[in-house]
């Protein structure tokens, strides 16, 4: 290492580059110099907009009404085409085909795999809304199943509740340490909530969530934005 440093010193001691030399080199080779974008280290706290009890009740009542229509003679397939919010199955009467365990969310799977054939379920609540399920056939560990999904339509009250929660969190943060704590306690982003909400180094010109990149652009270092809807 010492020999290498001595050899390097001998070479560089013979090099005499002035500031004007550097400036001229830059001007003459500006198109050859790669561009390195400014990167911003950013953190966030995500509060998802979730349906209130009122919204959940409205969705449940709608699914009950659809079940009533079917019990009164409306074909399941027609009900799915008219009412289902599942774009992947509604046009085929809600048919999901033969499916094994492990495909559906646990609430749907538990109901579907314990049902008798050709029985219409009560509304089954999942993260997606409420489902009406009908099992057509069983073959080994697979079932042929169809469903009608009624999604929770988020209301202005749902959005207001989420806004008030995130705004209250913001007002309680007085230091970067507090930001870390609040991210761990409240953030719904499970990819970084235990890491202080760290998003990493962001190129705001190419970041996929424009609302966030636009906010970063206008923020000073170590300041917290107002709540942003994405």
What are these regions (language model features)?
Residues 1-230:
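Peptidyl-prolyl cis-trans isomerase
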């Amino acid at each position: 290492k010492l020999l290498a440093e001595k050899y390097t010193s001998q070479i560089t001691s013979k090099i005499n580059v002035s500031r004007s030399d550097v400036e001229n080199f830059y001007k003459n080779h500006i198109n050859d110099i790669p561009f390195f974008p400014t990167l911003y280290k950013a953190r966030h706290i995500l509060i998802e907009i979730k349906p209130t009890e009122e919204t959940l009740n409205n969705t449940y009542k709608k699914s009950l009404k659809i079940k009533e229509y079917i019990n009164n003679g409306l074909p399941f397939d027609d009900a799915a085409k008219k009412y289902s919010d599942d774009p992947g199955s509604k046009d085929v009467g809600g048919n999901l085909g033969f499916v094994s365990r492990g495909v559906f969310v646990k609430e749907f799977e538990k109901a579907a795999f314990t049902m008798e054939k050709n029985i219409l379920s009560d509304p089954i609540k999942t993260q997606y809304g409420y489902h009406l399920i009908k099992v057509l056939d069983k073959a080994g560990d697979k079932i042929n199943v169809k469903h009608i999904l009624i999604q929770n339509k988020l209301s202005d009250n749902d959005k207001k509740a989420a806004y008030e929660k995130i705004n209250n969190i913001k007002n309680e943060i007085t230091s970067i340490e507090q930001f870390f704590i609040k991210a761990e306690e409240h953030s719904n982003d499970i990819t970084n909530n235990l890491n202080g909400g760290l998003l990493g180094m962001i190129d705001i010109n190419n970041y996929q969530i424009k609302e966030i990149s636009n906010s970063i652009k206008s923020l000073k270092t170590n300041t917290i934005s107002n709540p942003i809807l994405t």
